Amino acid sequence: MADPASYRPPPGSIPETPGVYRFRDEHGRVIYVGKAKSLRARLANYFADIHTLHPRTQHMVTTAGSVEWTVVSTEVEALQLEYTWIKEFDPRFNVRYRDDKSYPSLAVTLYEEFPRLQVMRGPKRRGVRYFGPYAHAWAIRETLDLLLRVFPARTCSSGVFKRAGQVGRPCLLGYIDRCSAPCVGRVDADAHRQIVDDFCDFMSGQTGRYLRRLEREMRAAAEAQEYERAARLRDDIGALRRAVEKQAVVLPDGTDADVIAFAQDELEAAVQIFYVRGGRVRGQRGWVVDKLEDVTTADLVEQFLTQEYLDGVRPAGTAGTADTADTADTADPAPAAQIPREILVPELPPDAEAVAELLERARGARVDLRVPRRGDKRTLMETVERNAKQAFTLHRTKRAGDLTARSRALADLQEALELPDAPLRIECFDVSNTQGTDVVASMVVFEDGLPRKSEYRRFSIRGVDGQDDVASMRETVHRRFSRYLAERARTGELEEYPGAPTGDDEAPETGRPRRFAYPPNLVVVDGGPPQVAAAARALDELGIESGPGGVALCGLAKRLEEVWLPDQDEPVILPRTSEALYLLQRVRDEAHRFAITYHRQKRSTSMVASALDDVPGLGETRRKALLRHFGSVAKVRAAGAEEIAQVPGIGPRTAEAIVAALARSAPGTDAAPAPAVDPLTGEIIDSAGVTR
């Protein structure tokens, strides 16, 4: 018996989207398949206190050894995929589907003179066209109820049909125009079969021409002032649009295709492949592979196709072995004999014709290698892409939460950077701006290889004009460590030093650690030699050594992922598959995310600033009232206190304060604000308050 906690996914790793989940036993066999509107909410139920679960559920979760899932777009797709995989794997705990029935389908008995629309289960019959399967029979009846008003085909049994013909009176559906009543001769066999053919075409996905035809008829009826008929056609159009929800995981019958998608970063890539056979998703496989070089998605596609279909082995990192910890197989490997006629990829490989020719030789027949651009195949590709991203996110979460991997990363960093101790506290700095405006910087902290978000800090750059990332980095590092020295001086560990902030920058005695109380074991800056030199200069100015015996410093350059140290002509090259480089990347990316978030926030705030912001007691509501009344700040400045006081909500005293504040911000004064944007109209306002 397994403990469910031993294979419970990490917190936050399960998506909140619709999907299908699979429990496997210790031998890898699928023992249960289920669907969920929210995978996170549903799977959380299985990992609750085991004593609160149903006895059968207890047995299932203790028999299982792992759980995996596949995300889809809608609940309908989840129902469809659940059905497919229950029939595929025959899981032992899915007992309610283990009878001799299958899911119901919508069947059209084309072999009859007057074809009938009906719910049908069991094996397929000759001369019957099927649509579905559906999860429930009531879903078929709802669909028919919507469509019969547009396609009034026969739905009654043979006995009812014959009896109506004998008495010369149709059933109720014939009286309410939901049946064309061929039983009493209202339409002949040819006319009724045309209705049935139109119904089949519509259910096959050819919806556009019927909708366009009904819309033309509706407009014509409205122009002819036949309003009742126009209203009925309008309702018919609505019924057609509600009747069929497109199912991306089900392609037209007979479609055999493999759908491949990737999610990647600089070091790794996740690949997902869905096997579509007979229009149904019959299986799914996924891997996370190492990238030994800077390859494009097209290169990844070529490597995957050759290894998956031509070598007969799984795609792999360096030696052709998959990362088994992140492999999710729901289908057998696809040898050359199973190469489908169509392979859908996100990008064509560089030499697509040659790859296609090799695949055709292996298959012995034509193979179409293509990128889906629209329609159901494009929608299915997007579903596979979401699964690849989800698998990649889960892989990164597992790796970041792996204590052994984190310990190895810290040890590797200590060795590579020749640090006296493992860098248990890492601080990373990044600068963000838009063409030199709203310049900000971020500081993120990782302790024991995990983010410590309560220690994150943001800096608004004050001493740098224009776009100068190097000077901004120097200011940021200088400000951070000057506060650290001030804290040491406050506690008596260090004598006072010139320029150290005191008093106002100190937190009250609350018992909590002060904002910059702890020194880092390693400082990482986002950038190459210029940024590293700027940070080292800031430390030197404060009398802090950068290197052994002081604060270790390095920079991580983008693209090539080189690690630069102060006063070194050559970078430190960490193996691309090392945990140390992966940790530095996570730290750098988190600093970049935090800086970008703050920069966007600050830029958004500055976009709605105006001279009226400096008026004491004037809130946003009254500022908008002023701008709505006068039209611009310039016209407010030109008005007198008495005129301003006429605006609703503005009293005489507030009007005088507005006049005084605008006078201080007039041209020629030191307090004149920079150009801003009128928050009401969106127009640009110059320093004189003139709207341009």
From Swiss-Prot:
GO terms, molecular function? DNA binding; excinuclease ABC activity
Localization annotation? Cytoplasm
What are the annotated disulfide bridges?
A: none
User: Which Pfam family, giving just one, matches this sequence?
Assistant: UvrC_RNaseH_dom
The record's InterPro entries line, in alphabetical order, gives: GIY-YIG_endonuc, GIY-YIG_endonuc_sf, GIY-YIG_UvrC_Cho, Hlx-hairpin-Hlx_DNA-bd_motif, RuvA_2-like, UVR_dom, UVR_dom_sf, UvrABC_protein_C
Domain GIY-YIG residues, every copy = 16-95
The residue ranges of the UVR domain are: 208-243
Metal-binding among keywords: no
Where are the residues of the annotated region Disordered? Answer: 492-511
Which keywords appear in this protein's UniProt record, sorted alphabetically? Cytoplasm, DNA damage, DNA excision, DNA repair, Excision nuclease, SOS response
Single GO biological process annotation from the record:
SOS response
Its cellular-component GO annotations read:
cytoplasm; excinuclease repair complex
Residue spans crossing the bilayer: none
Q: Which SMART domains match?
A: GIYc (SM00465), HhH1 (SM00278)
Describe the protein's quaternary organization and the partners it interacts with: Interacts with UvrB in an incision complex.
Task: Name the family the entry cites.
Answer: Belongs to the UvrC family.
Give the function comment from the record. Answer: The UvrABC repair system catalyzes the recognition and processing of DNA lesions. UvrC both incises the 5' and 3' sides of the lesion. The N-terminal half is responsible for the 3' incision and the C-terminal half is responsible for the 5' incision.
Which NCBIfam families does the entry mention? PRK00558.1-5
Report what the protein is called: UvrABC system protein C
Q: What is the lineage of its organism?
A: Bacteria, Bacillati, Actinomycetota, Actinomycetes, Frankiales
